[in-house]
Amino acid sequence: MSTEEKLNIFTQKLLEWNKIHNLTGSKSEEEVQENIEDALFALQFLPDTIQNALDIGTGAGFPGLVLAIAMPKTQWILTEPRQKRASFLHYMKSILNLSNVIVYKKRVEQIEAVPMDLITSRAVMKTKDLIDLSKKFITPSTTLLFYKGENLGDELKGMEHYSIFERGKRKYLLLKGDDVI
């Protein structure tokens, strides 16, 4: 199954589940597609050497599950403490045969510390709190990619080394481990 086919199945299943379980605010195929494009846009900023990745608060699959589909050679850990969303992620892992994905129905604080090449998160909490939660997974070469909104500037006070990329209202914050540990 191609990446495109997997993303199409993900879209349809998310819309089906969302009618019953209210997994995401995206209610139409267009809205889900926009969220997929939002997740995939960041691929151009990532190194191609990523072996493993952690997504904090995966929710209905953005960005972690979408990136795991697009990056099949990268081992992904998706953390989602809410039962209905974790169940959906397990279901998608199964029907899409995503052998590169591990889903934990836990908060990231409850996950065993393993050095990560990439840490992602979207709309979970403020940047400094995300960094603090991530510290046990960060090495000097870790890339941190946080999907943020328009008010990112307030969160960067006191930080010196970072890159910001924009797409519409989305701001992608890119940090290196050696700048935050």
Curated annotation (Swiss-Prot):
Which keywords, in A-to-Z order, does the entry hold? Cytoplasm, Methyltransferase, rRNA processing, S-adenosyl-L-methionine, Transferase
**Which residues make up the binding site for S-adenosyl-L-methionine?**
57, 62, 108-109, 122
Q: Name one GO cellular component term.
A: cytosol
Give the EC number(s) listed in the UniProt record: 2.1.1.170
Does the record's keyword annotation contain Heme?
no
Task: Please name the SUPFAM superfamilies in this protein's record.
Answer: S-adenosyl-L-methionine-dependent methyltransferases
**What's its catalytic activity?**
guanosine(527) in 16S rRNA + S-adenosyl-L-methionine = N(7)-methylguanosine(527) in 16S rRNA + S-adenosyl-L-homocysteine
InterPro entries membership: rRNA_ssu_MeTfrase_G, SAM-dependent_MTases_sf
Pfam families associated with the record: GidB
Chief subcellular location: cytoplasm
Give this protein's Gene Ontology molecular function annotations. Answer: rRNA (guanine-N7-)-methyltransferase activity
Role noted for this protein? Specifically methylates the N7 position of guanine in position 527 of 16S rRNA.
Similarity comment: family membership: Belongs to the methyltransferase superfamily. RNA methyltransferase RsmG family.
The UniProt entry, under HAMAP family, shows: 16SrRNA_methyltr_G
Protein name according to UniProt: Ribosomal RNA small subunit methyltransferase G
